[in-house]
């Protein structure tokens, strides 16, 4: 499959809106709650003078993460319900990783993928590093048979709970707690085939059996194996890399 460079733009919607950004931060609404989070690429000045927020995540002093949330208003510790496209219902929460348990900027990606699979009979797709499953459920809601893979038992448990919330518990979704690279290698040996693969790998991580993942070292082999699970009729291999500052051209090479 030849790399395809497409600009995807997310439109404002009821569940999420990017209200403003600047000075290394962004101001967002998630439903009726407002949050401030770091955004290193927002180097310009904000448009608004004030950002009244329920909570703000203040990062640590280095690029490797860290930091904490500071609440200006009470925020439920066990999360609160949100939805995507009035189809996927899930629990959002202020995580230690500066996000809220899902990635709203993936909205145009999920819509694009659904469009790619729209003409496929019984499409089968895989979500690697699938986290809490909002992307998995977005594709499942459009009729795809899904394989959801994440090394975290807790994340997969939350993804299954989100499927229950969405009324999708009986959908054809395989929930896999496993090291993504090992699982994909086994799928290659099994000669499996997919219509689409989405992966969102971290910079560094550990599998359920202590496997170590380092993006710069392990990504090329994983991508090579993913390509073996696709054929000329497959619709996409979609890689997101928020964890490191690489251009699409570098990744495409």
Locate predicted features.
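Conserved alpha-helix/loop element of class I SAM-dependent methyltransferases that forms part
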Residues: 104-121
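Non-catalytic substrate-recognition/targeting regions of SAM-dependent transferases
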Residues: 10-28, 35-104, 111
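C-terminal substrate-binding/active-site "lid" region of AdoMet-derived donor-dependent transferases
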Residues: 44-45, 210-253
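Conserved SAM-binding loop of SAM-dependent methyltransferases across substrates and taxa
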Residues: 132-144
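Conserved SAM-binding motif I beta-strand of class I
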Residues: 145-150
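Switch II (G3) loop of P-loop NTPases
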Residues: 201-202
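Conserved class I S-adenosyl-L-methionine
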Residues: 121-131
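S-adenosyl-L-methionine
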Residues: 152-198
């Amino acid at each position: 499959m030849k790399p395809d460079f497409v600009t995807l733009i997310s439109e404002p919607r009821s569940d999420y809106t990017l209200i403003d950004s600047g000075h290394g931060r962004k101001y967002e609404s998630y439903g009726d709650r407002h949050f401030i989070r770091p955004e290193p690429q927002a180097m310009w000045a904000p448009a608004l003078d004030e950002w009244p927020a329920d909570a703000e995540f203040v990062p640590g002093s280095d690029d490797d993460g860290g930091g904490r949330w500071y609440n200006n208003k009470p925020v439920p510790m066990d999360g609160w319900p949100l939805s995507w496209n009035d189809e996927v219902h899930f629990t959002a929460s202020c995580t230690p990783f500066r996000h809220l348990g899902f990635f709203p900027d993936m909205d145009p990606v999920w819509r694009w993928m659904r469009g790619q699979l729209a003409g496929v009979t019984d499409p089968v797709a895989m979500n690697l590093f699938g986290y809490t499953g909002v992307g998995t459920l977005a594709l499942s809601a459009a009729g795809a048979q899904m394989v959801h893979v994440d090394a975290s038992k807790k994340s997969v448990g939350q993804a299954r709970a989100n499927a229950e919330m969405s009324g999708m518990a009986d959908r054809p979704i395989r929930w896999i707690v496993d090291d993504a690279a090992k699982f994909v290698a086994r799928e290659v040996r099994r000669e499996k085939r997919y219509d689409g693969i989405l992966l969102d790998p971290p910079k560094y991580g550990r599998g359920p059996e202590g496997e170590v993942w380092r993006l710069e070292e392990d990504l090329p082999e994983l991508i090579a194996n993913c390509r073996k699970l696709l054929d000329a009729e497959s619709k996409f291999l979609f890689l997101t890399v928020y964890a490191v500052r690489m251009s699409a051209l570098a990744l495409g090479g």
